[in-house]
Amino acid sequence: MQNQKTVKIGNIDVANDKPFTLFAGMNVLESRDLAMQICEKYVEVTDRLGIPYVFKASFDKANRSSVHSYRGPGMEEGLKIFQELKDTFGVKIITDIHTEAQAQPVADVVDVIQLPAFLARQTDLVEAMAKTGAVINVKKPQFMSPDQVGNIIDKFSECGNENIILCERGSCMGYDNLVVDMLGFGVMKKASNGSPIIFDVTHSLQNRDPSGKASGGRRSQTVELAKAGLATGIAGLFIEAHPNPDKALCDGPSALPLDQLEPFLKQMKSLDDLIKGFEHIDIK
């Protein structure tokens, strides 16, 4: 079996052969109070179930389809909210950036900085992120094959940063649809020499009404897609939840209802424990 790398986020070990880590929260910071409410719920549930947890939210959705769509509070206000979440709940934080200038200020506050899928080949941004020394989560672009992630890993490595997590978020299937190739998880592990792979279930459920200005979604299939991904033996899940998904300011149609978080995670933990309890069978 290929050796699996471990990336440390504080006291959390993220690896394909360790219990799964949950990277989860809300799509975009809508308000300070809502962020506190959602984070508190995640912390309560993950503590109760013994699941390692990192809170996720964006301070700026810079790639919204429509210029009229809500983007977020911006970096300055967003970082204040993240710091309060850390101080209040002792939680680790992951968020995405979109420009080189954001890299260091964001890395000074959060624990993981995320390279967006649409920007994953932007070398200047990769270099700026790498130089922070932070743990990096790389979203695999929808247009990129799983074996091409090795090139992104190489860019970060050349810049001196080996603390890389890779995130699957679906692949384009014709126009306005995404599919997840379950064989791709193993390909990504091999292409990255065993880097931790996490699965963005929420954004893999996106689809689009060609006449609309925002993404649709298929949240009713969250459970089956998450189970399929975990069954391949991966390092973590990436999900978004909201107390009222139909009122969410971004990607509500793909978001898990917050009141279903605990039963969802109970099933995910049971499945992950089962899969990782099996002896590895190496077929060549």
Swiss-Prot record:
UniProt family annotation: Belongs to the KdsA family.
Where does this protein come from, organism-wise?
Aliivibrio fischeri (strain ATCC 700601 / ES114) (Vibrio fischeri)
Which EC number(s) are documented for this chain?
A: 2.5.1.55
UniProt subcellular location: Cytoplasm
**GO BP, sorted A to Z:** keto-3-deoxy-D-manno-octulosonic acid biosynthetic process
Respond yes or no to whether keyword Cytoplasm is given for this record. Answer: yes
Which Gene Ontology molecular function entries are recorded, alphabetically? Answer: 3-deoxy-8-phosphooctulonate synthase activity
Please give the catalytic activity noted in the UniProt record. Answer: D-arabinose 5-phosphate + phosphoenolpyruvate + H2O = 3-deoxy-alpha-D-manno-2-octulosonate-8-phosphate + phosphate
Q: What is this protein called?
A: 2-dehydro-3-deoxyphosphooctonate aldolase
Mind naming one GO cellular-component term on file for this protein?
A: cytoplasm
**Pathway, per Swiss-Prot/TrEMBL?**
Carbohydrate biosynthesis; 3-deoxy-D-manno-octulosonate biosynthesis; 3-deoxy-D-manno-octulosonate from D-ribulose 5-phosphate: step 2/3; Bacterial outer membrane biogenesis; lipopolysaccharide biosynthesis
Fetch the InterPro entries from UniProt.
Aldolase_TIM (IPR013785), DAHP1/KDSA (IPR006218), KDO8P_synthase (IPR006269)
**SUPFAM superfamilies named among the record's database cross-references:** Aldolase (SSF51569)
Could you name the domain of life of the organism this protein comes from?
Bacteria
Q: Which UniProt keywords apply?
A: Cytoplasm, Lipopolysaccharide biosynthesis, Transferase
